[in-house]
């Protein structure tokens, strides 16, 4: 092979190595982003579950108050 062909081959190999290195760096960044996003998703799930529990508790309290009011209104009707 001629010297020029070897130089071209070396250049192409170096370009490939550089590209692979950049892609590896990008993969690492994406892995880090994935970990962060998974942690954020877990936190959001936890917050959603807390809110759902609070909403359910509020609904139960609301139903209890409605029942108490109905009972009081029933007693008032009995008095009248």
UniProtKB/Swiss-Prot annotation:
Chain segments annotated as coiled-coil in the UniProt record: 3-80
UniProt superkingdom: Bacteria
Pfam families: ZapB
Location(s), subcellular: Cytoplasm
Major localization class: cytoplasm
UniProt KW Repeat keyword: no
GO BP field: division septum assembly; FtsZ-dependent cytokinesis
This protein's UniProt keywords: Cell cycle, Cell division, Coiled coil, Cytoplasm, Septation
GO annotation, cellular component aspect: cytoplasm
The keyword Transmembrane is annotated on this UniProt entry: no
Subunit record text: Homodimer. The ends of the coiled-coil dimer bind to each other, forming polymers. Interacts with FtsZ.
Family: Belongs to the ZapB family.
Function: Non-essential, abundant cell division factor that is required for proper Z-ring formation. It is recruited early to the divisome by direct interaction with FtsZ, stimulating Z-ring assembly and thereby promoting cell division earlier in the cell cycle. Its recruitment to the Z-ring requires functional FtsA or ZipA.
Protein name: Cell division protein ZapB
């Amino acid at each position: 092979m001629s010297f020029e062909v070897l130089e071209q081959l070396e250049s192409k190999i170096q370009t490939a190595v550089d590209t692979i290195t950049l892609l590896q760096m990008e993969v690492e960044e994406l892995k880090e982003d994935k970990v962060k996003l998974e942690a954020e998703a877990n936190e959001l799930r936890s917050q959603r579950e807390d809110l759902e529990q609070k909403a359910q508790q509020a609904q139960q309290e609301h139903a209890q108050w409605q029942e108490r009011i109905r009972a009081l209104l029933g007693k008032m009707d009995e008095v009248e």
